[in-house]
A protein has these predicted regions:
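Histidine-acidic metal/acid-base catalytic patches
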Residues: 2-11, 16, 20-34, 63, ...
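Acidic-and-aromatic substrate-binding clefts and catalytic sites of carbohydrate-active enzymes
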Residues: 13-22, 42-58, 76-91, 117-124, ...
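Active-site acidic/histidine proton-transfer and metal-coordination neighborhood
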Residues: 79-174, 227-229
Length: 263
């Protein structure tokens, strides 16, 4: 299936770099790995800097055939907290208006936000909040579920809540590395994951690996090591699949290996 899978890319693959250098690294990586593509690239918070009009103009000039999508928590206004599905208040409206404006410049028409936290609102209230966001905005707002965290109770963090997300009939994004953490805590629910991926409400899927404890964005080298890999065939044709694997880990290991060889 690896040969047939069309995996789009994200600047999370090269964390810590400014957006333009990250895109240069992504371009090189797509030349080495035929399953990776740059038709649609997500601009992620792991990148250094803030997304603004000037950056988007520069990106479109250098990569005219690529659509750029803002990823959840990406910095668009200096000093502002990111908006979650559970966020509310006037500052949220200001943030969303700027986000919508930038998204219209990119032409992609969609933005995904993290589900948020129980200390901000209940799960059902969050679903209602996201429905309102979608009715008020002329872009699609998709919810990205989370996983169990130590210090804060996230919304959409276990299988029961992922089932409720499926039943809520709202747009969503599935991060399979998040589901690996849920599976480590509660056991696998293959049929539920299959249904989540197969739904028309699943607008995008994020891929990376981890050991089931932290969202560490490890590279996936051999698909047979990932329990979720065979389930990707159930995705709708319109669902976009993105790599979020941190490839700077591999670069660091190669540099250390070369230093040892030179000694």
């Amino acid at each position: 299936m690896m040969e047939n899978l069309n995996i789009q890319t994200t600047t999370a693959m090269f964390p810590g770099l400014p957006f333009l250098p990250a895109l240069e690294q992504i371009s090189r990586e797509t030349q080495k790995r035929p399953e990776l593509h740059m038709d649609w690239v997500q601009l992620c918070p792991q990148s250094f800097g803030c997304v603004n009009d000037g950056l988007l103009v520069s990106l479109k000039e250098k990569y005219p055939n690529t659509k750029f999508q803002l990823h959840s928590n990406v910095r668009i206004i200096h000093g502002k907290e990111p908006v979650h599905g559970s966020s509310s208040g006037k500052w949220v409206d200001v943030y969303l208006q700027e986000l919508i404006r930038l998204t219209k410049i990119t032409g992609c028409g969609i933005y995904s936000i993290h589900s948020g936290y129980e200390d901000e609102m209940s799960l059902q209230d969050m679903f209602s909040n996201v429905r309102k966001m979608n009715s008020d905005c002329d872009i699609t707002i998709a919810i990205e579920g989370l996983y169990p965290e130590r210090n804060r109770e996230a919304l959409v963090r276990n299988w029961d809540q992922y089932q409720q997300l499926l039943d809520a009939d709202i747009p969503y994004a599935i991060d399979l590395s998040h589901l690996n953490i849920v599976a480590k805590a509660e056991g696998h629910r293959f049929y539920l994951v299959q249904k989540l991926l197969a739904s028309y409400n699943c607008k995008e899927v994020h891929l990376s690996s981890n050991h089931g404890r932290l969202d560490s964005h490890l590279p996936f080298i051999k698909e047979k090591h990932e329990w979720w890999w065979p389930l990707l065939e159930y995705c709708q044709a319109e669902t976009r699949i993105f790599s979020e694997e941190n490839l700077r880990i591999q670069q660091s290991k190669r540099k250390k290996h070369n230093v040892v060889l030179r000694q």
